[in-house]
Amino acid sequence: VTPLARACGAEVVGTFLLVLFGTGSVAAAVMTGAQVGLWQVAVVWGFGVTVAIYVTAAVSGAHLNPAVTLAFAILRPKSFPRARILPYWGSQVVGAILAGAVVLAVFAPFIDRFEEERGIVRGEAGSEASAMIFGEYFPNPAIFGTGPEAEALVGPLMATAVEALGTAVLVFVIFALIEPRNGARPMWMTPFFIGFTVAILISLFAPITQAGWNPARDFGPRVVAFLAGWGDIAIPGPRGGFLAYIIGPLVGGTLGGLLYDLTIRSALPVEDPLPSEVSRGG
């Protein structure tokens, strides 16, 4: 088995864990009320990211996110060859699809009850309220509902910009935490701080876009929802909304990494102040 195959396998496993914990927490909150408040969901997401990174970082670098992979390929090509972009992306999407399928299998009766109680017809307008446990929608249907009044609050351009902003912050932090010349980097605590950053970003921006920051996390479960009867509500989504969760993170992640290089990395000492460690993405 080649090193690339092992790395891709780790990306499948890591992305599966991340998406399972994250979308599972959303499903539990929306369908059963198990989590009370956005911060509880955000914390589960954050710990899911942390666990997934600890499990896979030594094998693949734990990108677990196409936006992180693209940023590394463009800005750190010596450590991450660009030929690995598509294999990593494919692995991440596969892991996310598998996680979405597990969430559907586990929560299927609760989804049916949720839709029946609220008169939701799966695949029709308004079924974003149940589809949101898989893909993401703007604004957050659990907070603002669905329909024209809700849609007037957040347009596709704003949603794309918010997704770009959140992913830019995330990759900026990741680059800072793993930079060998950063004498203050937390070493083995790096995955925790990446997960904590994700939790903070979710708590801030989830009311607006559900806070994706990860094209695989959004698209993989969307595929499951599409096949499970949500159809156009899943892909392309109302107002073609799924594109916001692909374009925004891919652009924002690279811009965030570039901003780190221009503002902080360029000011760091030339010598590596600490022993090198495995690069960890998020």
Question: Where are the regions a protein language model picked out?
Answer:
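Membrane-interface helix-loop junctions and terminal tails of multi-pass membrane proteins
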Residues: V1-G282
